[in-house]
Amino acid sequence: MENVGTAASATPKRARARNRRGEGGRLREDIVAAAVALLDEAGDERAITLRSVARRVGIAAPSIYPHFPDQPAIMLAVVQREFAELRDSLRAAVEKAGADPRKRLYAVCGTYLDYAGAHPERYRTMFGGLWMPDLDGSSLTEADLAALGDETMRILVDALAACAADGQSASTDPPSDAVALWLGLHGLAHQRAVSPAFPWPEDIADRIITALAHLNA
């Protein structure tokens, strides 16, 4: 894995062509994409600095400020982007699974675990909280952080609630049970990442889902 210093000091890209009027949104997207690329390469959010991002995009660091007032704002945008990607993947999985509530719940959980396995650095950053600054010293607000993951959790809650309504789950409190299920999935995703040599049972995910979602036999 490339170390943080190497990623941050990588050869800068050629100077970026100046945006035409009305294309400022494209630069914002490029800044976020550059930050994600740095995270993927270094495996450490500390590689994402104003200078390293500017170098990757091919702009001067001050050009970032009209779009992001500080580094935490860039990190927030990265995490928001990844949650949106996860949300879209979960929605697609639900649609593909068909009408059966149990299949939909398994599709949501399986897609969640697949995302965590395919993007370990991004996943860790989304849920690790290591990048979150002291709110008094950054442009972020408590509301910014509290909203992260709301839509993805709602998909899980709805999937479990549908199982309960269909008589396939004994859950009497789908929102709370969905939180417990998420904790189980998150724990599995984390442990798979840090203990890849452990002999995980092939059906461990199914066991977690069945138990924590209170699915009927």
Short names for language-model regions:
Residues 115, 158, 162, 181-199, ...:
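Amphipathic C-terminal alpha-helical segment
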Residues 27-36, 53, 78-86, 90, ...:
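Generic hydrophobic, amphipathic alpha-helix propensity
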Residues 1-26, 37:
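N-terminal intrinsically disordered/low-complexity leader segments
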Residues 91, 133-166, 175-179, 206-213:
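Amphipathic alpha-helical packing segments from all-alpha helical-bundle domains
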Residues 30, 41-73, 77:
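Helix-turn-helix
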Residues 91-121, 178-181:
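Hydrophobic alpha-helical connector segments
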Residues 118-139, 190, 194, 198:
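Amphipathic alpha-helical segments used for helix-helix packing
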Residues 81-105, 137-150:
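Amphipathic alpha-helical linker/stalk segments
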